[in-house]
Regions:
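Phosphate/nucleotide-binding beta-alpha loop and adjacent structural elements of enzyme active sites
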Residues: 1-295
Length: 295
């Protein structure tokens, strides 16, 4: 009898747990905390990039190490990577085209701004899609060095230009908080992970950068800079108004980031936002990445 009671209680708990998960998007919507819509909310998979990253890691091999960096052969090509950085997490994002596929992907001949280039995973994606020129913007010295080594031929050919600054709403300098995992490096001290080092990095606005480089146009902006997106976009108003680029923005860093980013972009020019993959935090559902298409 005791065993039967235990099995019954276990079944009740399992039933309630299943329906709690099933009903979460509805509850989130009723509370006004679902920015993805009920249908898209069911695609929110915790740690999806870790799952895909593990698959890519199993198909990759370490070629050599030098100066605290590692050279990896991966299904997406060779990449230099700082030791301790989760390379395969970001490669998984490109593997599933997290920053845009179909009409939201980089197009042949595009001039691309990669804001938050990290070690160059999206640089490779943009070049593979046929980009004419990729401006890799990465202020962290060790990550920038990886871009320099990985894309030495493309840099020499003029298809990639490396800018070792952080995009912001004004010029100057600012502290950047570095972690053992370079994915967490940020101007906004927001991670629970211990800070390994603090460095001072130069700041530049996107509008100034475009003018200094003499770019004839900007066709695509990808931005994933760990919560600094709103300030960086405030410094891109002229570029957005003038060139109306396709924009792909990481909006996963806080539940309110999607609304703030959308407001800034729409204040600059008419755009249609489209949710990419959905993510969740407690009862909040919001887009991991949002695609903005000029109208």
């Amino acid at each position: 009898m005791t065993i039967l009671k235990a099995l019954f209680l276990l079944a009740v708990v399992a039933y309630l747990a299943y329906h709690a998960v099933y009903l979460t998007p509805f509850v989130s919507s009723l509370l006004g905390r679902n920015q993805c819509g009920i249908r898209r909310s069911y695609s929110a998979i915790p740690d999806a990039n870790k799952v895909e990253g593990a698959k890519l890691r199993a198909r990759s091999r370490l070629i050599k190490e030098a100066d605290g960096l590692e050279l990896w052969q991966t299904p997406l090509g060779e990449f230099w990577n700082p030791r301790g950085n989760d390379l395969f997490y970001t490669l998984a994002e490109q593997w599933v085209r997290n920053y845009g596929d179909g009409p939201y992907r980089v197009k042949p001949g595009n001039i691309v701004l990669d804001c938050g280039a990290n070690v160059g995973d999206f640089v490779r994606e943009a070049l593979s899609a046929g980009a004419k020129l990729v401006i890799a913007i990465e202020p962290v010295p060790r990550s920038a060095e990886c871009v320099r080594r990985t894309f030495a031929p493309e840099i020499a050919a003029g298809r990639v230009r490396l800018v070792e600054k952080a995009v912001w709403h004004e010029a100057g300098t600012m502290k950047m908080y570095l972690h053992d995992n370079a994915l967490l490096d940020t101007l906004m001290q927001r991670h629970e992970a211990p800070v390994a080092q603090v460095v001072e990095v130069p700041l530049i606005t996107i509008d100034t950068l475009v003018a200094e480089l003499g770019l004839p146009r900007v066709d695509f902006i990808k931005m994933d800079i760990e919560g600094a997106e709103p300030n960086a976009l405030r410094g891109a108003r002229g570029t957005i108004q003038t060139f109306r680029p396709q924009i792909s923005i990481a909006t996963e860093h806080s539940p309110g980031e999607y609304a703030e980013v959308t407001k800034i972009i729409l204040a600059a020019a008419p755009y249609r936002p489209t949710c990419g993959r959905c993510t969740k935090e407690d009862l909040d559902f919001f887009p991991e990445v949002t695609f903005y298409t000029p109208q």
